[in-house]
Amino acid sequence: MRIKNSVVVITGASSGIGRATALAFAAKGARVVLSARRKDALEAAARECEERGGEALVVPADVADYAAVEELARQTVQRYGRIDVWVNGAAVSLFAPFQEAPLDDFRRVLDVNVMGYVHGARAALEHMRRRGRGVLVNVSSLTALAPQPYSTAYVMSKAAVTALGASLRQQLRLEGHKGVHVCTVQPATIDTPFFQHAANYTGRQVVAMPPVYSPERVADTIVRLVRDPEPEVTVGPSARAVRALTRMNAQAVEKVMARQVDKAHLSRQDPAPAMSGNLYTPSAGSGDVHGGWHGRRRTAGRRLAMVAAAAGGTALAVAARRGALPSPDGRELSWPRTR
């Protein structure tokens, strides 16, 4: 699909990956429709999009509310006459021991991260199926491939998003909608404000687990998928490597992932008060693309080597430590080198 003048709806566009994606499409001349709960942040993002050469429409919405998502689609079609691309990117998270997670908070994560994507998919596909073409992009996570502890609701939601994409692709194929594509993006840890905004009942500050990649990397992947759709793609060498290692020895990866979350995802130095984060009320401010985590890469090679050693033995560990891993198709996967 040609990007210039295409109509692109993006949920979660006020910050992080969603905002970076809006800017990437705008820079290529797309007409972007920005949605999230924070109108002021969306308006700031819209100004940035217009400065980069795109046209922007702001439609605030809580994706957990289907009527609001339907209104988002209606306003898009009313303004531009069609929907070419829909990016489901709005997401929230909850960190807590499973037994201590407030059930209302747990349910809210699933409402936003699962039902929000269902709402977006229904609204988008209604228009795309009628026109016979379009691209739906669902932003999932590395945790859909390698689940982690203390964020059960989030992990469940991202696994559901991956399954949603696979199920929709099969249905569209059976119905003969060859021009309508559903793509799932599974990023590794990304440098966004997501972790600062998360609900947290662990008593420990949540930090981004290295290696950390830029949100622009995810945005560029999404733009590429619109031009050349693929069913599922990972973003970041660590995500590709973990996917390969999980296929070799899922149990070993699971054990190492648990240790690394305890050591590198939840701070042992900085306590944190219990809070519901942005689950019910949007975070204050005009929104940021980056979260200030991009320096957390120095121990990446050592961590991957641990996973590789547990999953596949010495040869894989050496390859991981040196900065490369074989992919399932035999190609080499690069990895950020330690310093």
Task: List each model region and its residues.
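Conserved glycine-rich cofactor-binding loop
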Residues: V7, S14-S15
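Conserved glycine-rich Rossmann-like NAD(P)H-binding loop of the short-chain dehydrogenase/reductase
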Residues: A30-A44
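Substrate-binding pocket helix/loop in short-chain dehydrogenase/reductase
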Residues: P97-F98, D105-R107
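SDR active-site lid
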Residues: L174-R268
